[in-house]
């Protein structure tokens, strides 16, 4: 059993890693995905609202709906985040009058950003695992010495 001077630093280090570093790393993901929505909340629209906002013929809307449906399935399979697709979709559209020219570029851009977000998730998981192991080691060292 460790003495008080060695146990307390172990507990403090454990608390610092879990309560300060861990949440900070997780916040990176939420900041990178949702920062636009914090400053521009009108971008948070459901997919039907996006379609209703688009200018163009019914055929253009049908094509867009189908591509949007395919993209939603892709994003949900890869990331599992239902809000992320709409935010990036509206962010990339820019102008609702240019949907015909932008839709293919939009889907390509979104797919490439998709992999960037997946890398962020992997990085956060690695840092979190390292944080848990490090904090457990520090805590046990302080507790057992």
From Swiss-Prot:
UniProt keyword annotations, A-Z: Membrane, Transmembrane, Transmembrane helix
Main location per the UniProt record: membrane
Record-annotated membrane-spanning stretches: 20-40, 116-136
Membrane topology term: Multi-pass membrane protein
Annotated Gene Ontology cellular component terms: membrane
Note: Partially overlaps IMP1.
Name of the protein described by the UniProt record: Putative uncharacterized protein YIM2
Recorded superkingdom: Eukaryota
Gene: YIM2
Organism the protein comes from: Saccharomyces cerevisiae (strain ATCC 204508 / S288c)
UniProt subcellular location: Membrane
């Amino acid at each position: 059993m460790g003495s008080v001077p060695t146990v307390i630093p172990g507990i403090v280090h454990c608390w610092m890693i879990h309560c300060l570093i861990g949440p900070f790393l997780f916040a990176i993901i939420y900041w990178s995905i949702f920062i636009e929505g914090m400053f521009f909340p009108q971008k948070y629209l459901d997919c039907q609202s996006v379609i209703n906002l688009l200018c163009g013929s019914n055929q253009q809307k049908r094509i867009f709906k189908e591509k949007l449906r395919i993209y939603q399935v892709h994003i949900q399979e890869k990331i599992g985040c239902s809000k992320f697709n709409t935010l990036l979709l509206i962010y990339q559209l820019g102008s609702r009058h240019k949907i015909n020219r932008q839709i293919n570029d939009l889907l390509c851009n979104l797919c490439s950003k998709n992999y960037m977000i997946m890398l962020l998730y992997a990085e956060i998981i690695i840092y979190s695992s390292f944080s848990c192991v490090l904090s457990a080691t520090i805590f046990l060292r302080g507790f057992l010495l």
